[in-house]
């Protein structure tokens, strides 16, 4: 994992208005992705989920998939991230026909940067979504461990307001 010169490691929870740390991670195909490159094509909805192939994470990820046309209409991109391996992300993608990148943050470095890595919990990261504008500032932070649809639904609401 790498971060750029104006993104320093920050273990505090990232908040609305903060500059989102840039990073480089491999996706489910083994291709390297950076936040800054993805932002060239529009806002990014970056959602952290605890573990691929689990019931709640599958529901959340599939809801993001099912709303693909709405995200596309707003010129935004969806980007999932967990501490699973590239192979596990590939399996999760194939099993659920996901149409967006899933990043493998195996060591939890990016989760630490965004302040969502748990220290002693079975769930490795806090289920959190960051809506990031093209200027790399966080437009909104969405938290919910119980309502899986909230993440995609609220992200769309934020993106609509940004576009208005």
List each model region and its residues.
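Chalcogenol-based redox active-site neighborhoods
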Residues: 1-164
